Amino acid sequence: MKNWAGNLRFGAKRYHTPHTISEIQKIVHDSDHVKVLGTRHSFNNIADCQVDLISLESVVPRISVDPTNREVTVGAGVTYGDISTFLRDSGWGLHNLASLPHITIAGAIATATHGSGSNNGNLATAVTEIKWIAPDGSIVAHSRECDGGDFEGTVIGLGG
């Protein structure tokens, strides 16, 4: 498997394409080292892993809007193209957009991908809660409200 440009080859022993969150939980639980691979829009090997790579391309995109709290909830595999269309059709929008519709929202958040304009915060600045799968397979939630300053370190990380 190669990156988007075809100039990097991924070296993972196993490549997983789960369809459900429970399948992802099992893979994470059973693996010694795992990374989630987005749309492979990486310019270097930081996204690579020597053991298990998980692709979210087969997980059904989940997007919901809570108009009362003015919040949008998305699954990790949702792309900018998915969310832009959904939000437009719902009368909503994002404060900043990356230029590539095929990259995932989770990937853009985790790498602090910039969008348009130097005065606009990246998408990670709008995240209020994040859920992730711990090594034991459990789902862990962190929020800006409950975790304060530590929250930013949870949201942005390059996947070392």
Identify the role of each PLM range:
Residues M1-A5:
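N-terminal regions that are enriched for targeting/export leaders
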Residues A108-G160:
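FAD-binding subdomain of flavoenzyme oxidoreductases
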